Structures are given as C-alpha cells and as structure tokens.
Amino acid sequence: MSDRTSASSSSRRTKQNYDAIGSFVIDQEIGKGSFAKVYLGRHKVTGALVAVKSVELARLNKKLKENLYGEIQILKTLRHPHIVALHDCVESSTHINLIMEYCELGDLSLFIKKRDKLITNPYTHDLARKYPVYPNAGLNEVVTRHFLKQLASALQFLRAGDFVHRDVKPQNLLLLPSPHMMANNKTAKHIMSGSYDSFTPAAGLASAPMLKLADFGFARVLPSTSLAETLCGSPLYMAPEILRYEKYDAKADLWSVGTVLYEMVTGRPPFKASNHVELLRKIESSGDVIKFTRESVVSQEMKGLIRALLKKNPVERISFEDLFNHPVVTEPIPGLVEDDIPKPPRRRSLKEERPVSRAEDSLVPSRKQSLRKDLADREGAPQTAGPSSPKPRRSSPLATPNEPVEISKPNYFQIPPREDRLSYSPRKEAADGLGIKRPQVQPSTSAPTRPSSYVDRRHRSSNASLRAPVREANPPPNDVTRTKPRGMGTKPMTEEERAAQDIAFERDYVLVDKKHLEVNALADQISMYPQQPQSPKSAQIVRRATQQGSPTSTSGAVPSPPSRALQLAQGHSRQGSYDKALGTSPSKATSVISKAIQDASLRLFGFKYAPHLLSKGPSPVPMYNPFPTYPAPNTPTGLISDGKQGTPVDEDSRVAQCIEDHATRSDVVYGFAEVKYKQLVPLAPSMDHGLGGAPIEKSAEEDGLTAEAIVSLSEEALVLYVKALTLLAKSMDIASLWWSRKNKVESTNSITSAARDSANSEALALRINGAVQWIRSRFNEVLEKAEIVRLKLAEAQKRLPEDHPSHPNNHANDSTALNSLSTVGVFLSEGISAERLMYDRAIEMSRAAAINEIANEDLPGCEISYITAIRMLEAVLDQDDDHLPKRKVSGASKEEKTGANELSDEMNNEDKQVVQNVINMVNNRLTVLRKKLRLIESASKAQQQEEQKQQNLMRRRSGEMTSRSVPA
C-alpha cells in the first residue's frame, strides 16, 4: 500500500513540474480511453488550442501498437474538413503523443444524449430553436441529414483512398461549433486548424455544428476487391459479418453508418444486448425488419436508407456509390428555416465584375485554385515549413465574412470528386515534418506512474469548454524535449463530462483473441466428421452464428432457444453449483443432455445424433449445462465420475477419456465461478442493462452490494472463469492433436472406409465430437461471462475510495495484471488466484461431507461432494504443459499462457505434494463411503427381499384360507 501511495504522489509531483510536450503546454485532462488519455493543450507562442492524445506504450500489446502506428500513418496521409487532422506526433521511450485538432463540442453520442438540453447551450441554442427535438424521439431530421452529408463526405474521401475505418460510431464523430458561430464570435479562443479549409464544411449547413470523423486506430487500406478477417470495432455498431468472424470488406462501415443514423433519428441504437454474441442473435432474428419508435418523426426516404444500410447480408446492403448518390445525401434538406435556405450567388454588374474578379483571383481563390497554388508553392518551398501554411488558413472564408461560402451554393450538398480531395492533401509534402520525433529519454521521475483504467473509454477529444474557435497559424516546427503529460489538480466534472461517462460502456471495443476463433474453427471441422445416416428431416439447418458464410438459409430453420442470460432475465432461478445438477440420476442427466445435443446439432451443424443412441425425457433447466455423458459404449452417466472405468483399449479411447476428464474439471471450476457470478449478477444484463442501456454502475448499486464486495466477487469470479477457460483450451488442444493425427493417418491409409464402418469407431468419433461441441459451447459462454465480470470489476474499482489499494490511481506497474484468453490489463488484488480459491473450496466441501458422513446424513450428497472436491483439486494440479506439448498456436496464445502461469503462481513441488495428499485422503474417504453405501444398498435389498417373501407368504396363506372356506 505504501509503495502504491508513494508512486501515486510521485506521479502528482511530476504532473506539477512537467507540463510541456514539444511546442505545446498541457493544460488539463479532457478525456480518457482504454490505453490513452486526452489533454487540452495550447501552443506556447500563439496560444492555439489542440488536443493531445497521450498513449502509454507499456500498456499496449503488439497488436495495439500496430493499430496505433497504423493510425499515425493514416492520419499523416489524410486531410479533409470532416476528418480530425493530426498536427504533429512526438514520441518518448514510454509515451506517444498525438497532437490533433481540438473539437470542443465533444462527440455525437453526447450530443444525442443531451438533445433535450441543446436549447440551454449558447452554441446550440439557435439550432435547437429552429429545429426542435420531439418528445421521446431522436434529433430533428434536418440535423440528422446535415450530419449524414458531412459523414458521407468523409467516407467518400476514405473510399477514394481505399480506406476502411472499421469503428464508425457516435463516440468517434466529434463536433465543432457551427461555422457561423466560429466566424461571428469575436471572443472565441484560437483553435489550431489542420489546413486552410479545415473549418469550412464540404457539405451540410453552415449554421449547424461541424462533424469530424476521428479515431483511426482500426482503420486500414482495404481495396474493394480485398477482404479482412480481424474482429475489431465497437460491438454495438459492429457489422454482423464481423460478429460472425467472417471475412468482410469496406461494406462493414455501411452497417455502422446505418446504426449511427438510426440512433440519431430515434435516440437509441437499433440493437441492444449484453454482449456481442447476444447482439448477433438479435440481428439474425430480426430478419432485416427495422422498426422505428412511434414517437420518432422520420421521413420515408430516411427510413428506406436506414433499412438499406442495415441489411445483415453485406451482399444485399446498399453500396457506397448508391449511398453517396442517395437523394437523402445529394438533394437539399427539406424543412429548412428561411435563414438556412441556400441563396444563389449575387450577380455582379459588368462594371464591378472585372476588378473584383481579379481581386478574388489573387486574394480569395476558389477551393481548387487555392489548392493548386498551395501545392505549387509547397513543392518549391523548403521542407522546414510546418504541416500547413498559416497564410492559406487565414484566407479561409470563415475569416473573411464577405467571401462567398461554397456550401451556400445550390449544389453545396454535392461531395467533391476524388481528385479534388486527395490531391490537396498537404500530408504528402509534410510527411517529413510529421515523422515521429524521439527526444532524449527523460528521467523516471518525469513519467506518470498511474496507468489509465482498462475500460474507462471516455470521450476522445473535448467536452471541457464550449467556446467558439478561431483558426490560428501552426506553431514553429522546432520541438522541445518532450516531458510527460500530467493531469492537473482534480476539478469538479462538468455536466457534459458526467453525461459522457454514462455511455462509457458503449465506447469499449472488442478484440477477440485468436484462441476463440481456433476453438470454434476446430469444433466446426470435427463436427463434419462422417456421422451415422440421417433422415432428410434431420438435415434441415440454420447456419451457426460464428460459422463463415452468410446465414441466409431459412429452410427448416429451428429457432434458437433463449440464451442463458435471457432465461435468467425471464425468471429462471439459479441452482447452487453443487446441488441438483450433481445429484441427478443417470437417466435424468442423460435425457436433458440428449435433447440439448440433438437440438444444438441440428441448429448449429446440420445433423442430429441418431435418436436411438440418445435417451429422452424432460428435465428442469439447471443453472448451467452439466458436462454431458456422450452416447458411447461403457461411458459414465453422471456429471462427475470417479474415473475408474478401466484402461482405454486403444489410443482414440484414451484421447476421448482425456478430453472428457479435462472438460469435467473445467465444469467443476465453472460451477464454482457461477456461485460468485450469481451473487454478482442476480439477473443477467437485459436490454436495459448492457450495451446501449443503463450504466453498469446502476445495476450494481441496485443489487445492494458495496464497491468492495463487488471488487472481491468480481476478482474471484474472473480468475475462476479464466481457469475454466484454460482447462477448456487444453481439452481443445488435445482434440486438435488427435484430429491432426487422425487426418494424417487416414490420408495414408487405404482401408479408411472399412475402419469408419466399424460401429465402435463410429461411436467413438461421435463421443469425441460430442465432447468437442460441448467444450466449444462452454468456452464461448465462459468468455462472455468473463467479459461481463471484467467490466463489473473495472467499474467497481473506480468507485472505491482513492486511498484503497485497488483503486485505479493506486495500480502500480508491478500490480497483478490478468492477461488471459478474455482480459487484458485487469488489475487484481494481491493474493487472488484461482488455485487458492479452489483448494479452499475443496477442503471446505470435504470437511462438510465428512461431518455428514459421520452423522449418516445425506450420504449420496457426501459422495457427490467428495467427487467434486477431487475434481477441483485435480484442476488445481493441472498445469498447461501436463501430458501435452507446449501450445504454440499463435503469439496471442503465448501471451495467454504467460498470463495464466503468472496467475497460478507456478505451484512448486512441495505445494503439489500437499494437494496430492489431500486428493489421496479424500479418495480414501470416498472409498469408505462407497463401501458403506454398498452395504446399505445390500442391506436394503435384503430387507426388500425379506419383505417380499413375507408378502408372498401372506398371500399364499390368504389363498389357502379362502379355498377351504368355499366348499363349506
């Protein structure tokens, strides 16, 4: 604690003494993201305002660093009025600082959320008065069309360069005060512009706020004939083809545009869910039917465009060309007030036309003329000039009120062609001046030691002040040695900032690990292994959500059952992790599992297991699906077996048994994690609590748990879920090795068909396939719940007192960081590990079972507790490299393994021996208990037989007496 406190105080001292980055002075923190903080900066000489995005390199893995450098390279080549410009980039040994345009009205998500209060803001008062917001509706359609025109202009510019943004969402659409406000407000502060026309809209209204597309961390060059396969972006606005892990093209941005448009006109996203898997289910089940709220006032043209954009099949989705030529984008905005109706340019008399035109040609050139002149001047000028020339920027129409503004012409809504946009980019000649500068390494005391919280993805630019900007010349190109940005003294948050924090959950983006994809891909491959002949009826399919391809087939579709979260939200109660699920009889366990396997197989993979191999029967919905008993000869029937099944007769049987053993251990760990999850999330997130809904803080507070309790439960649940994921991943690794070996053998074996015809081989393949499909389903489910718990943990840590060791301000660099299959950069309290929790739980269960055994109470329950404790202790001893070559699937997998090893604290041999001794002790108790149960069962059978004999004797005697009395 003392170390963390001293580190925090050292960080505060650093921020007081060093507040300069190159030629800019850092004023205050105005935003925070997952890996970066955004500061308000000003030029030392001119005082022009900028936004400084400071990224701590130590918090980035290899993939995120590539995204950051990709963003820098892309922004260097882009210059457009509706794209946030990069002024400069300064790098040190620990941080990268991006000097960018400052957008003081915040982002579009805040604008939509505060739409009812726009009338109270002096910079949006006139807009709200002219185009009011209807009750319970979104923005006025005039404003929506205005923003769409500007967004389309930016996207057309990107498509001309074969760029795909991949993260279009309201949080990445930043706003500036309207050009009229900027031109007429004499008290406005200077804002450094990226180019001479940076504050001149290319489309839309001059009286409405100006929109700029920001955050190119996921952008990349993607020609129209190419496909990408990386899952990235924000889940709420992510295209379904990305959610399905399919390859996708630039049309993914069109889906995001559709979601943004829908949110602007209705005030809410089109699809809301607790996680991206549930989100995909809702998108798929909608059937491309987009409904609008009754309160929304939306024209038919706008509805048609939104529906064309929100087609789940990218082939059916509207094209970029059709979007750019759509009447909503190209035609004048209907419903404008008189002041905003474009006026034709004033015709000059012949007398004044000639001298004025010469003056305009020399002083105020048109956009294309000034562009060519500017480029010609720059080609002949030395490279010591800054990124943009002050003179063209001062000659902007915004600085000259009497200059004709291009957007006021009748064709202002037409987007300039490619050559008019790409050709005037000053990034080409300024590339050398925007190269990343590496000043001398600073002392360690100059670096902030307080890393930003993982999920606190706040507004990216500025909500701090609401003053109209004025363009200012760029600063001198010389850079002073960079020092770290530091947060100023804590200031009370403004209303806008608090509102922005309410939607912090929507700002998170998803980076799905390759292990997730590998698990699903392997399960898909194994599921296609030849099965027994199926009837035509059982071959009807619905494509699985994560399977590649477009799920357009609806023939014989089987509706998906409610997700587990939905079942809980609808009132299904959870059971204890070691209650009824572990105590079900073999017949009951098999019945529910059989039905689940049949339904899941038909829905996901296109075949059913043969009905005669699976038993039937109803069963109540358990808290979680128990690890199933698969239809194979001599397989155990309970959830957890004692493992005494004899030695497998062949290699395939041994592999199947090994896979099931690891899966069974993971199921026990999962059940323990569910106990924590049940306390943490009594009801699963619903439409009102999750993506696009109420803040996570609200649901936690309503549960009546303190912040410390939530942190403790979240940490324990998270490490247990990660342990379960590790065991499941190991099972899939074993299956992967078996699958590779089997394919290799069959490819060289000429008698493969004969082997496959064997009933035993077929049943064994069915057994392994069933296990793999169960593991895939459980893996995906655990991954979802781990993400929910991670978000709960991060939010709860922020609500702790600032002097609490788990508060984000006190996270030292050497804090326990969980870097696993599902989480990155989560800080845990000291002493938290899944192995310790599992060991304590196993001891507790064993002691309770021993007490009940001595008292002869609930002996079957004691047997279940002993078996569960043994499986949990075996999971404690289970290491990632036991009985298996070290996994080397990808770089990400290596990092996962490292994180998992750090989490388990690498048990030494002495600790392992202690755990093994406990396992032996519990096994002995289990053996004694089973002998007692067999004796009780034998005695019970003997008693039943004796009672049966007595009953038969009584019947015989009764019959003799009756027969004697009849003749009399």
From Swiss-Prot:
Region feature (Disordered): 334-500, 528-585, 884-906, 939-968
Keywords recorded for this protein, A-Z: ATP-binding, Autophagy, Cytoplasm, Kinase, Membrane, Nucleotide-binding, Protein transport, Serine/threonine-protein kinase, Transferase, Transport
Biased composition (Basic and acidic residues): 350-361, 371-380, 417-431
Gene Ontology MF, one: ATP binding
Residue spans crossing the bilayer: none
Recorded topology in the membrane: Peripheral membrane protein
GO cellular component: autophagosome; cytoplasm; cytosol; phagophore assembly site; phagophore assembly site membrane
GO BP, sorted A to Z: autophagosome assembly; mitophagy; piecemeal microautophagy of the nucleus; protein transport; regulation of autophagy; response to starvation; reticulophagy
Catalytic activity, as annotated: L-seryl-[protein] + ATP = O-phospho-L-seryl-[protein] + ADP + H(+); L-threonyl-[protein] + ATP = O-phospho-L-threonyl-[protein] + ADP + H(+)
SMART domains, per the entry: S_TKc
Extent of Polar residues compositional bias: 441-452, 528-538, 545-557
EC nos: 2.7.11.1
Residue ranges of domain Protein kinase in the record: 24-329
Enzyme kind, highest EC tier: transferase
Active site: 167 (proton acceptor)
UniProt binding sites for ATP: 30-38, 53
Compartment(s) of residence: Cytoplasm; Preautophagosomal structure membrane
Highest taxon above the source species: Eukaryota
Family membership: Belongs to the protein kinase superfamily. Ser/Thr protein kinase family. APG1/unc-51/ULK1 subfamily.
Function: Serine/threonine protein kinase involved in the cytoplasm to vacuole transport (Cvt) and found to be essential in autophagy, where it is required for the formation of autophagosomes. Involved in the clearance of protein aggregates which cannot be efficiently cleared by the proteasome. Required for selective autophagic degradation of the nucleus (nucleophagy) as well as for mitophagy which contributes to regulate mitochondrial quantity and quality by eliminating the mitochondria to a basal level to fulfill cellular energy requirements and preventing excess ROS production.
Subunit structure: Homodimer. Forms a ternary complex with ATG13 and ATG17.
Protein name as catalogued: Serine/threonine-protein kinase apg-1
Species, as recorded: Neurospora crassa (strain ATCC 24698 / 74-OR23-1A / CBS 708.71 / DSM 1257 / FGSC 987)
